[in-house]
Amino acid sequence: PGSPQKRAASPRKSPRKGSPKKSPMIRAAITAMRERKGSSVAKIKSYIAANYRVNMTNLQPHIRRALRSGVASGALKQVTGTGATGRFRVG
């Protein structure tokens, strides 16, 4: 019989619009709070929960990773604690 028919090209999906990047959210939280000793992780999380529409249970490991990478890159300065605990300031 005949040759196989070609399938119609499927329409391209638009890129998924998820939550904003974590590091700008953390930087915005720290600068908005303007705490003298630096901002604690709990305060940063509560600021993000209050000001962004995000699911905090899914976001917590991403916040920890963003804090560690921010300290490693020099964008954030860790005043007290180690890892993703303690208090943080902007670079």
From Swiss-Prot:
Renumbered residue ranges of the record's region Disordered: 1-25
Cited function: Histones H1 are necessary for the condensation of nucleosome chains into higher-order structures.
Chief location category: nucleus
PANTHER family, per the entry: HISTONE H1, HISTONE H1, EARLY EMBRYONIC
Pfam families: Linker_histone
Annotated Gene Ontology cellular component terms: nucleosome; nucleus
Domain H15: 18-91
Listed name of the protein: Histone H1, sperm
SUPFAM superfamilies hit by this protein: Winged helix' DNA-binding domain (SSF46785)
Basic residues bias: start-end ranges: 9-20
GO molecular function, one term: nucleosomal DNA binding
Assigned protein family: Belongs to the histone H1/H5 family.
Domain of life: Eukaryota
Keywords: Chromosome, DNA-binding, Nucleus
